[in-house]
A protein has these predicted regions:
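Short amphipathic alpha-helix that is part of the acyltransferase structural core
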Residues: 1, 95-131, 252-257
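Conserved donor-binding loop and adjoining core beta-sheet/short helix segment
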Residues: 1-48, 161-179
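Active-site rim helix/loop that mediates acceptor-substrate recognition in acyltransferases
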Residues: 1-8, 127-154, 162, 168
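Acyl-donor-binding surface of acyltransferase catalytic domains
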Residues: 32-101, 240-242
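Conserved acetyl-CoA-binding loop-helix of GNAT-fold acetyltransferases
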Residues: 34-46, 180-183, 189-202, 227-228
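Conserved hydrophobic beta-strand within the GNAT/NAT acetyltransferase core sheet
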Residues: 56-60, 178, 212-216
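Conserved active-site alpha-helix within GNAT-family acetyltransferase domains
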Residues: 62-80, 194, 206, 218-236, ...
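C-terminal "cap" of GNAT-fold acetyltransferases
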Residues: 81-103, 210, 215-220, 232, ...
Length: 257
């Protein structure tokens, strides 16, 4: 599912593991000679399209790719940036009045682990950069320090969040990072997302963390909630461009008529 290649002309990484689940492929071009860029880009996006990707995300570290870039029948018309957001811990005792509990995920119960993954994957299906996580990967991430919580309303699991301690290798500063936060579609617009964020902040304060962080795309509507609650953009981590196979889209449209 993951292809890597590096030589004297280019260096790239392609993740096609999300095609079956989300219809997405992710291409990262780290280096490429300008004279070879379009040829390499076309080869990679065509390969992803042939393998079933309806939407192709490309991160270009070379600076060659811009909005409006055209390569045969692929045009790169939209983009989004991934940002690191930060906030100093400040616990707000105010809640939304929503009767929500945060329940630590019981990793010994395989059914609960699977249900957690299913909800997480469903929530992230439309999120920019969203990737599918298997039960096996979730358990590996937990073993490496990630803490996962189900947001429950009565007996119903209505959402989730996960967090992990992150250390800045350059400064030695420690952050408590929000790894994920999501709400089931049937329970959205009820203040549950905000409630989950406040619970994350409470958990950070209880464990003595002074700095909070998260990574979020500026095309993700949730970023407006985070900014309203005091999170600030500290650093832009990457820019991603999106494209589709317009030739395949036209073919599929004609065959539906």
């Amino acid at each position: 599912a993951v292809i890597r290649e590096e030589n004297e002309h280019w260096s790239y990484r392609v993740n096609q593991g999300e095609i079956e689940s989300f219809g997405k492929a992710y291409i990262q071009i780290y280096a490429c000679d300008e004279c070879d860029f379009e040829r390499l880009l076309l080869r990679l996006v065509k390969q992803a399209s042939r393998n079933g990707a309806a939407q192709i995300h490309v991160r270009d570290n070379t600076g060659h790719l811009k909005i409006g870039y055209q390569a045969e029948y692929f045009s790169f018309d939209t983009s989004y940036n991934q940002w690191k957001l930060v906030k100093t811990t400040k616990v707000d005792s105010k809640t939304n009045g929503v009767a929500i509990q945060a329940v630590s995920l019981d990793t010994s119960d395989s059914k609960l682990v699977e249900e957690y993954c299913n909800l997480e994957n469903e929530c992230f299906k439309q999120v920019p950069g969203g990737v599918k996580r298997t039960s096996k990967q979730l358990l590996l991430d937990i073993a490496e320090g990630e803490r996962c919580f189900s947001l429950c309303k009565g007996d119903a699991q209505v959402g989730f969040f996960s967090a992990k301690k992150i250390k800045n290798e350059e400064t030695g500063e420690e952050f408590f990072e929000l790894e994920s936060l999501g709400v089931s579609e049937a329970f959205r617009n009820q203040g549950i997302g905000k409630e989950g964020l406040l619970m994350f902040e409470q958990l950070a304060a209880e464990n003595g963390y002074e700095k909070l962080s998260m990574i979020c795309a500026d095309s993700n509507p949730a970023i407006y909630l985070y900014e309203r609650l005091g999170y600030q953009k500290e650093k832009m981590l990457s820019t991603w461009y999106t494209t589709r196979d317009k030739k395949r889209d036209l073919y599929e449209q004609e065959n539906k008529q």
